[in-house]
């Protein structure tokens, strides 16, 4: 059985992510134990809250270097994806620097912030996360900050401006939306992470 570990960042709604995997029949463990994280087959980096609070908690739990050195697949969700970039404008804090790019506040285009609700996602590169999911499917977003499209974007969305809905580099994958709140498409994405992303 695949060992799936949810990294306890100390500021995330971990239970909803765990329940999403439970519904799919996968066993997961929530932990910040370094040895368990290092030995996991697949890892989830969730996040709700602010980038500076999350980075502070990761530093306090001595997780930053551990995460940076992981070689197994890691899926960052929402703030977890933003933490994978180099820097976040939210609190002006250096982040994990796993994937190039910066997280900036969504520009004021007259739309309310945070973006909260369903939005269309366009796949721009082949990625196993989206295997079997129809192009321009809808996923559920809650965010005021985003990563501009770059060479590591595998999907984009638009909320006044285009932004990265998903990024990937080597073993690190990130999604700006909440798959655990995105119905069948989100469930399939989580299943794809477990079953289609190689490790």
Curated annotation (Swiss-Prot):
Coiled coil, from the record: none
Query: Domain of life, per the record?
Result: Bacteria
Q: Which UniProt keywords apply?
A: Amino-acid biosynthesis, Cytoplasm, Glutamine amidotransferase, Histidine biosynthesis, Hydrolase, Lyase
**Per its UniProt record, what InterPro entries does this chain match?**
Class_I_gatase-like (IPR029062), GATASE (IPR017926), Imidazole-glycPsynth_HisH (IPR010139)
Could you tell me what reaction this enzyme catalyses?
5-[(5-phospho-1-deoxy-D-ribulos-1-ylimino)methylamino]-1-(5-phospho-beta-D-ribosyl)imidazole-4-carboxamide + L-glutamine = D-erythro-1-(imidazol-4-yl)glycerol 3-phosphate + 5-amino-1-(5-phospho-beta-D-ribosyl)imidazole-4-carboxamide + L-glutamate + H(+); L-glutamine + H2O = L-glutamate + NH4(+)
Glutamine amidotransferase type-1 domain boundaries: 3-199
Name where it's found: Cytoplasm
Q: Name one GO molecular function term.
A: lyase activity
The pathway entry for this protein reads as: Amino-acid biosynthesis; L-histidine biosynthesis; L-histidine from 5-phospho-alpha-D-ribose 1-diphosphate: step 5/9
Gene Ontology cellular-component terms listed: cytoplasm
The Gene Ontology biological process terms listed for this entry are:
L-histidine biosynthetic process
**EC number(s) of the enzyme?**
4.3.2.10, 3.5.1.2
Task: Locate the active site.
Answer: 78, 178, 180
Quaternary structure note: Heterodimer of HisH and HisF.
Function text: IGPS catalyzes the conversion of PRFAR and glutamine to IGP, AICAR and glutamate. The HisH subunit catalyzes the hydrolysis of glutamine to glutamate and ammonia as part of the synthesis of IGP and AICAR. The resulting ammonia molecule is channeled to the active site of HisF.
Protein name, please?
A: Imidazole glycerol phosphate synthase subunit HisH
What high-level taxonomic lineage is stated for the organism?
Bacteria, Pseudomonadati, Pseudomonadota, Gammaproteobacteria, Pasteurellales
| Gene (name only) | hisH
